[in-house]
Amino acid sequence: MKKIFFIHFHEAELKEKIQPLKQAGYKVEHHFSVESVADLQQDLPDILVICLDRLPSHGRRYAEWLWEAKKRQPILIVFCGGTPEKVLITKEKLPKAIYCSNEKLLATLEKLKQ
């Protein structure tokens, strides 16, 4: 099963969003704090999921950092949620990422595991 690292900057919402993924059998690690940085250096995920509903610029920065190094470029990045304007800005900066609504996140991840 794919290992997912989920970033969303609201703890209660994050716990709600990762529950269906865990129930589907995914191993999900997560980060919600703006006061600390997620440690992705040692144990890289198969997929980085970033919710654009809150602080989308912070999430974009994680994605940019991840793909800065060639060894991390094969890691898939999935952005979910966000206003149309924030999604458009993110697509302009990271066109190779995958985009979906919050409601279609699990279905999108299921397609990626094939």
Where are these regions (language model features)?
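Conserved acidic carboxylate
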Residues: 7-8
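Two-component/phosphorelay signaling modules centered on CheY-like receiver
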Residues: 11-31
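Acidic, metal-coordinating helix/loop segments flanking the phosphotransfer/catalytic sites
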Residues: 32-47, 57
